Swiss-Prot record:
It comes from Saccharomyces cerevisiae (strain ATCC 204508 / S288c). This is Mitochondrial GTPase 1. Residues 42-228 form the CP-type G domain. It is found in: Mitochondrion inner membrane. PANTHER family: MITOCHONDRIAL RIBOSOME-ASSOCIATED GTPASE 1.
Length: 367
């Protein structure tokens, strides 16, 4: 998808002569990072779904389109009785943007989806998710739904969107409730790079039976799953790269840095007090090499290492930047519902026989 955001919002610059780019070049890059262990995980999903009461799909709040996986949409539509909850992670990196949250609300209402925002390390946020699980379990029990195997939720999402961190946080809360004073051991590996979890984990208990519920609640952690090349494009791949949802070396760091610069200038987050990059307040630029020269702390630092350092800083700690340019479009210029339906049409009907060949495809294919 080639996005032109010209005219979609008023761009105000402290430098009146500066005009941001409204289109981003199509650099040559892989468009998918789909791997063999992900195919195996998807086959496992099909077997597990009849046992599940809820699918929890995690997405990065900064990239609601890039981290939405159409494969999960297809799976969820096969199991109509399974509730799906979308959880946007890294809420702390998108503070106070009410218009954006309002747009997300409208998008999900179009599709009849439920969603919440949270910081996977924030105990209050995580407890709120636990309350949702407990309430859904309570409603099921109220309608006579005793579950001998417990209430089960499958945690899914793109690589490195916070699945394992969330599970560890939920497990920590449970551990502290039943084992006061005893040391807690993580049950799911976490990391700053995509691909830490590579296999579907054992069932993880997060609540016990009590006077209010006969059902225990269990979670199943899963590896991050990418998308096939035919439902990806340059914007999606660059958005995933900035989120850390693909391997660092898959997309050229200069391309990533240039995309970040493009998004920064488009969104005009500059409030006149904080520099997004050196000179952004007084001398904004569309030239990524100019920005990299400004960022270099010494002459021995090359452009790629500077680009990696800058994008990593924003990936981990940068606040307020949206990584999907479609979010900047007006409602009459971009339809979320049409976007999702188009993705489903491109994906087609999937059977799990021969799934490896169907999904892997050519990493550079765009159809």
């Amino acid at each position: 998808m080639h996005i032109n955001v010209r005219g979609t919002r008023k761009i105000i610059s402290n430098v009146s002569s500066f005009t941001p780019r409204y289109e981003f070049p199509k650099y040559s890059m892989p468009l998918t990072d789909f791997k063999g262990h992900q195919v195996k995980a998807l086959k496992t999903f099909e077997k597990l779904l009849p046992q599940m009461n809820m699918i929890i799909e995690l997405r990065d709040i900064r990239a609601p389109l890039s981290t939405r996986n159409v494969v999960f949409d297809r799976i969820a539509r096969k199991e109509h009785d399974v509730m799906k909850l979308v959880v946007y992670t890294r809420k702390d990196l998108m503070p106070g943007n009410k218009p954006y949250i309002g747009k997300l609300k409208n998008w999900h209402e179009e599709l009849g989806e439920k969603f919440i925002l949270l910081d996977c390390r924030n105990k209050t946020d995580v407890r709120n998710l636990l309350k949702i699980l407990e309430w859904q379990n309570y409603e099921l029990e109220t309608n006579g739904g005793y579950l001998p195997m417990g209430y089960r939720a499958l945690i899914t999402g793109m690589p490195n969107v916070g699945k394992s961190t969330l599970i560890n946080s939920l497990r920590t809360i449970f551990h502290n409730q039943v084992n006061m004073g005893r040391k807690f051991k993580k049950v799911a590996k976490t990391g700053a790079e995509a691909g830490v979890t590579r296999a579907t984990s054992e069932v993880i208990r997060v609540t016990s039976r009590n006077t209010e519920s006969r059902n225990e609640i269990y979670l199943i952690d899963t590896p991050g799953i990418g998308v096939p090349g035919r439902v990806s494009d340059h914007n999606r791949m660059l958005g995933l790269a900035l989120c850390g949802s693909v391997k660092n070396n898959l997309v050229d760091p200069i391309f990533q840095a240039d995309y970040l610069l493009y998004l920064m200038n488009l969104q005009n987050l500059n409030d006149g007090r904080t520099e997004l990059y050196p000179g952004s307040t007084n001398s904004p630029t569309n030239d990524i090499y100019d920005v990299l020269r400004r960022l270099q702390v010494n002459k021995s630092q090359n452009e790629k290492s500077t680009a990696i350092e800058w994008t990593n800083k924003w990936r981990l700690h940068g606040k307020g930047i949206i990584f999907d340019p479609e979010v900047l479009l007006n409602n009459d210029e971009f339809s979320y519902k049409n976007y999702v339906n188009d993705q489903l049409e491109k994906l087609g009907d999937l059977s799990y026989e021969g799934l490896s060949n169907k999904l892997k495809g050519n990493p550079n294919q765009v159809f």
